[in-house]
């Protein structure tokens, strides 16, 4: 019997082919998607039959694969899911500055299609990301006039509904605001409490931090505001 050795392992290779206990796997979009394929376990006989079907189809013959080959393995349900969200908006005179649903006094605010709440937007994206769903811009496109000037609490409530529908609850949330001015510390607790209320979460699982950008680039020059959020979702 010939032996093949690699850096990782040593595997015995039989001198002749054998069909004993042979299994084949077919990657198919049935029950999955183009980006998340499902795997179908085929016996040797089924594999040969399917090869004939594919060959016949390639030659132009009208042949249909039997449905019994489309049995798929159910998706694994995860106990925990982690998501990250990021958002940034320009700061312009004449707009309100709303952070976490709280109106913050300032000489400029966020220019955006909705109310421009950078914190709530990135929280929504973090939840959607953890659930493996499209981002906030796809679910609430800025090309849709019905979201013009909409309060971001609408987006948060929809994200919470989707989370609940998927069978998950918030384990914890950690958010970071990045802006040069104004100082967030006088308003931080009000922002956090409102965020907890919108999420239906205990305050002990929601954390909020604020950082300046050391007067570097648009964030440090009071021309923009940004936020990052990480969430942990737990299976109910």
Curated annotation (Swiss-Prot):
GO CC annotation, single: chloroplast stroma
Location(s) in or outside the cell: Plastid, Chloroplast stroma
Record GO biological process: isopentenyl diphosphate biosynthetic process, methylerythritol 4-phosphate pathway; terpenoid biosynthetic process
Residues bound to substrate: 87-89, 113-114, 117-125, 135-137, 140-144, 179-185, 210-214
Keywords, sorted A to Z: Chloroplast, Isoprene biosynthesis, Lyase, Metal-binding, Plastid, Transit peptide
Binding site for a divalent metal cation: 87, 89, 121
Transit peptide start-stop: 1-55
Pathway: Isoprenoid biosynthesis; isopentenyl diphosphate biosynthesis via DXP pathway; isopentenyl diphosphate from 1-deoxy-D-xylulose 5-phosphate: step 4/6
Cofactor requirement: a divalent metal cation
SUPFAM superfamilies named among the record's database cross-references: IpsF-like
Catalytic activity: 4-CDP-2-C-methyl-D-erythritol 2-phosphate = 2-C-methyl-D-erythritol 2,4-cyclic diphosphate + CMP
GO molecular function terms attached to this record: 2-C-methyl-D-erythritol 2,4-cyclodiphosphate synthase activity; metal ion binding
Job of this protein: Converts 4-diphosphocytidyl-2C-methyl-D-erythritol 2-phosphate into 2C-methyl-D-erythritol 2,4-cyclodiphosphate and CMP.
Protein name: 2-C-methyl-D-erythritol 2,4-cyclodiphosphate synthase, chloroplastic
Organism encoding this protein: Catharanthus roseus (Madagascar periwinkle)
Lineage of the species this protein comes from: Eukaryota, Viridiplantae, Streptophyta, Embryophyta, Tracheophyta
Gene designation: ISPF
